[in-house]
C-alpha cells in the first residue's frame, strides 16, 4: 500500500493545494477528510487557476477518484455551485464520490453561527460564518442530519422537524430573530439531495478497498495544525481535527493504514482571524511579505496576519502529526529581505521555553527568541535544483530543517507545478 497524508503545519493557508496537486498526479484516490467550505485552496490546472472549497484537488487528475469523506461537513448548495463552477470550465467530475455518512450544513447552522458570533462581541473568534461549528455541535449531540438522511424523504422530514423545534426556540427567545421555515428548507434540501445522489456512496469501503489493492491514496488536509480543536490555539480554532489523526477517522480507515505524513508550511507564518500569533509582524516587513505573497484569504478575501517562521510551533506540529517530511512553500517571497528571522524558542516569565503553551495567558506573555540569517537578492523563481539556490537561501533552509527537526521533501519557489524543487518523493520514502 502507499498512503500519504498532507497536513497544514501552521494556521492554514500554507499552500497544501500545490502539494496535493503534485502528489495527486500519481494518486488513484484523493480524500478530503474534515472541515467544510470554510477553507479554500487554489489549484493551477491546464493553465487555469481554480479556487476550490469542498471538492478535493484530485478532481483534476485523470482517472483519479476524488472523495469527500465522512468527517467533512457539507453545504449542499455550496457543493452544487462548485460542481457547476468546474463543469462550466470543462472539468470532468465523474470521479467525485461523497460519503453517505458526512454531515450536512443546514440553513439554521448558518444563522446560528452568525447569531453566536454577534453575541460574543469583542470575544468573537473570527468564524467564517459558514455554519461549520454549529454543524459539528449537532453531530456530537447526535441530532445532525447526514447525507444519507437527505436521500430518505421521511427520515429527513422527521429529523428536520425535530431540529427546528429546538433551533427556532433559540432564534426567537434567545437571539431575537425570526424562526426558519420547515417547508422552505425541506423542499430545497430534499432537492439538493436528489441532485448529489449520483455521487453518494460508502466511501469508507471505497478507500479501504483501494488501499488493500495497493492503490496510491492521498489524504488532503484542510486548515492547519494550529487550528486543530485539540492541539491548536483554543478557542481560536476550527471545529475539527486538521491534524494527521483526523485523516483516518474522517475517511473511515484504520490508523495502521497511514504510511507517510507530509507537513506543509510557508517560509514565514500567516493566520486569519483572531487569536495568538507570537511572531506577528505589524511593520513594513509584514506589509512587504503580505503584498509579495498575496496574503489574502481564498474564501473571505480578508488580509492575513503575517509573521516570521515559528520553529516552536513547527516542532509542536511535527510531534502531534508524526510528520515524516516538511514541504516548504513561498520561499521566493522572502527574496529581497536583507535579514530573515526564525523564532527558535520563546521567553516566558524570564525563562527560555521550547514548547508551545496551551494557556492563552502564557502565550500572551511569550516573547519570541529569534535567530537571524542573511537574506538574498537573487531571483529564485526558475530554480529547479537545490544546489542552484543562493548560499544564503540554502543556509536558511538548513536552519529550518534543524530547528523544525524534520527533513524537507519539497521547496516551492513559485505558484506553478514546475516551480518546485524535489528533494524526496513522499510516495517512495
Curated annotation (Swiss-Prot):
Pathway: Purine metabolism; AMP biosynthesis via de novo pathway; AMP from IMP: step 1/2. It is found in: Cytoplasm. The active site is at residues 13, 41. GTP binds at residues 12-18, 40-42, 304, 330-332, 412-414. Keywords: Cytoplasm, GTP-binding, Ligase, Magnesium, Metal-binding, Nucleotide-binding, Purine biosynthesis. Substrate binds at residues 298-304. IMP binds at residues 13-16, 38-41, 128, 142, 223, 238, 302. GO terms for cellular component: cytoplasm. It catalyses: IMP + L-aspartate + GTP = N(6)-(1,2-dicarboxyethyl)-AMP + GDP + phosphate + 2 H(+). Pfam families: Adenylsucc_synt. Mg(2+) binds at residues 13, 40. Its main location: cytoplasm. SUPFAM superfamilies: P-loop containing nucleoside triphosphate hydrolases. Plays an important role in the de novo pathway of purine nucleotide biosynthesis. Catalyzes the first committed step in the biosynthesis of AMP from IMP. Belongs to the adenylosuccinate synthetase family. HAMAP family: Adenylosucc_synth. Homodimer. This is Adenylosuccinate synthetase. The gene is purA.
Amino acid at each position: 500500500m502507499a498512503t500519504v497524508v498532507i497536513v497544514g503545519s501552521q494556521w492554514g493557508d500554507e499552500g497544501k493545494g500545490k502539494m496535493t496537486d503534485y502528489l495527486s498526479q500519481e494518486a488513484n484516490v484523493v480524500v478530503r477528510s474534515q472541515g467544510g467550505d470554510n477553507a479554500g485552496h487554489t489549484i493551477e490546472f491546464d493553465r487555469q487557476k481554480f479556487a476550490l472549497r469542498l471538492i478535493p484537488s484530485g478532481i483534476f487528475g485523470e482517472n483519479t477518484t476524488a472523495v469527500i469523506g465522512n468527517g467533512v461537513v457539507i453545504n449542499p448548495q455550496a457543493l452544487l455551485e462548485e460542481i457547476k463552477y468546474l463543469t462550466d470550465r470543462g472539468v470532468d467530475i465523474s470521479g467525485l464520490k461523497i460519503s453517505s455518512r458526512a454531515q450536512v450544513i443546514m440553513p439554521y447552522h448558518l444563522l446560528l453561527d452568525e447569531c453566536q458570533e454577534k453575541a460574543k462581541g469583542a470575544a468573537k473568534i473570527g468564524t467564517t460564518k459558514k455554519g461549520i461549528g454549529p454543524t459539528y455541535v449537532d453531530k456530537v449531540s447526535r441530532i445532525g442530519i447526514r447525507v444519507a438522511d437527505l436521500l430518505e424523504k421521511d427520515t429527513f422530514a422527521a429529523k428536520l422537524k425535530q431540529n427546528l423545534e429546538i433551533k427556532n426556540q433559540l432564534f426567537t427567545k434567545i437571539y431575537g430573530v425570526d424562526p426558519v421555515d420547515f417547508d422552505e428548507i425541506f423542499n430545497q434540501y430534499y432537492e439538493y439531495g436528489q441532485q448529489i445522489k449520483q455521487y453518494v456512496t460508502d466511501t469508507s469501503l471505497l478507500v479501504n478497498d483501494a488501499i488493500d489493492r495497493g492503490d496510491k491514496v492521498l489524504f488532503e488536509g484542510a486548515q492547519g495544525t494550529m487550528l486543530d480543536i485539540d492541539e491548536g490555539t483554543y478557542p481560536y480554532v476550527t471545529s475539527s481535527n486538521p491534524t494527521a489523526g483526523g485523516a483516518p477517522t474522517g475517511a473511515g480507515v484504520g490508523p495502521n493504514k497511514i504510511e507517510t505524513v507530509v507537513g506543509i508550511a510557508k517560509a514565514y507564518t500567516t493566520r486569519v482571524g483572531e487569536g495568538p500569533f507570537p511572531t506577528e509582524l505589524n511593520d513594513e516587513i509584514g506589509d512587504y511579505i503580505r503584498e509579495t505573497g498575496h496574503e489574502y484569504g481564498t474564501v473571505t478575501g480578508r488580509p492575513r496576519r503575517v509573521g516570521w517562521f515559528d520553529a516552536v510551533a513547527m516542532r509542536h506540529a511535527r510531534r502531534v502529526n508524526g510528520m515524516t517530511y516538511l514541504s516548504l512553500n513561498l520561499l521566493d517571497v522572502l527574496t529581497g529581505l536583507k535579514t530573515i528571522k526564525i523564532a527558535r524558542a520563546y521567553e516566558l516569565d524570564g525563562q527560555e521555553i521550547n514548547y508551545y503553551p496551551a494557556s492563552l495567558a502564557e502565550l500572551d506573555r511569550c516573547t519570541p527568541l529569534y535567530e537571524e540569517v542573511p537574506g538574498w537578492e537573487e531571483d529564485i523563481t526558475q530554480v529547479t535544483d537545490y544546489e542552484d539556490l543562493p548560499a544564503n537561501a540554502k543556509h536558511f533552509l538548513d536552519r529550518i530543517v534543524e530547528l523544525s527537526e524534520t527533513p524537507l521533501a519539497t521547496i516551492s519557489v513559485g505558484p506553478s507545478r514546475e516551480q518546485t524543487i524535489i528533494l524526496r518523493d513522499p510516495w517512495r520514502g
